A protein has these predicted regions:
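Residue-level detector of functional hotspots within protein domains
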Residues: 22-24, 63-68, 105
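Iron-sulfur (Fe-S) cluster-binding modules
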Residues: 1, 136-138
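Residue-level signal for the start and early helices of compact helical domains
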Residues: 3, 44, 68, 73, ...
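Cofactor- and metal-binding active-site motifs of prokaryotic enzymes
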Residues: 49-58, 64-71, 86, 116-121
């Protein structure tokens, strides 16, 4: 039996990180170095599924109609279509260039079906839990 391999739509979704940001060009350059086109996501697209925003074939467009205020969630970088080596390269490039984006995620078979707003909320919960555990251990 042959495994069905879904085509990958490489991209870097960027939430709440304006192109006027001083390190925007460094972000774009780092993504281009590993073959990822940068796709800024507007607050009116927060109800669309992550898969649809990435251009994954067969992904449903929107699960909810939603318009988020940019201050609802901090900046996020959501990556699709990278192997481990390219992911490590990208993260090192971002660190070297001084690009700081608080939330980062890789698209998975599960989260590609979520609305962007749900993924952002989950990333914030995870970040808060990590901070809580770190504070508890100090």
């Amino acid at each position: 039996m042959k495994a069905r391999i879904r085509p990958v739509a490489p991209c870097a979704l960027v939430w709440n990180y304006p192109q006027t940001e001083p390190s925007w060009s460094a972000l774009v350059a780092a993504c281009e170095k590993v073959g990822l086109p940068v796709k800024p996501v507007s607050n009116t697209q927060a109800g669309h599924t992550v898969g649809w925003l990435c251009g994954i074939p067969g992904a449903s467009e929107a699960s909810v109609l939603l318009h988020l205020a940019p201050e609802t969630y901090p900046a996020a970088l959501i990556l699709n279509g990278l192997d481990r080596k390219h992911l490590d390269t990208l993260l090192a490039e971002l660190r070297t260039a001084g690009v700081t984006i608080p939330l980062k995620a890789v698209v998975t078979a599960t989260n590609q079906q979520w609305p962007l707003s749900e993924l952002l909320a989950e990333l914030c919960r995870e970040r808060d839990e990590i901070a809580r555990r770190a504070a508890k251990n100090t």
